[in-house]
Amino acid sequence: MRTGNVLVVEDDDIIRRLLIECLKGHELVNVDGARDGVEALHQIVTMRYAVMILDVMMPKMSGIDVLDSLKALMSDPSVKSIDDPPAVLVITSAERSALPDDLISRRCPRMVQRVFRKPLNIEELAACVETYLPV
């Protein structure tokens, strides 16, 4: 079985809690939540995550801004938790025509693994998360 740390970054409390509970139900070792990009970056520099589920549209700092900040942090040798960045699964309610998948993926091609559109298929998302967890 694969296990690891997962960070769910979603500003909607209900969606964030639902995702956390669903992933915990899949027996993942640790699932944390963050309400916005600022909180997420703080957590990422203090703990190593295998997977980050990242909403695009959030207050304070968007998911795109989080990706840009992660790229900058990865080049900082003093931040050890980012030397092996998490696999990022982006979630968004934006229409594909307004925010194409490749536009998101190009921002951080080493990290963004997949883009999911809301409403989410939770089982599909959980299965995808599991593929990026260490064995």
Where are these regions (language model features)?
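A Lys-centered signature of the CheY-like receiver
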Residues: 118
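Hydrophobic/aromatic residues positioned on beta-strands within the core alpha/beta folds
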Residues: 91-93
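Receiver (REC) domain active-site loop signature in two-component systems and cognate sites
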Residues: 58
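Alpha4 helix (beta4-alpha4-beta5 surface) of REC/receiver domains from two-component response regulators
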Residues: 65, 85-86, 95-115, 123, ...
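Acidic catalytic/metal-coordinating carboxylates
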Residues: 36-39, 62-68
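Conserved acidic carboxylate
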Residues: 10
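Active-site residues of response regulator receiver
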Residues: 55
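Two-component/phosphorelay signaling modules centered on CheY-like receiver
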Residues: 13-32
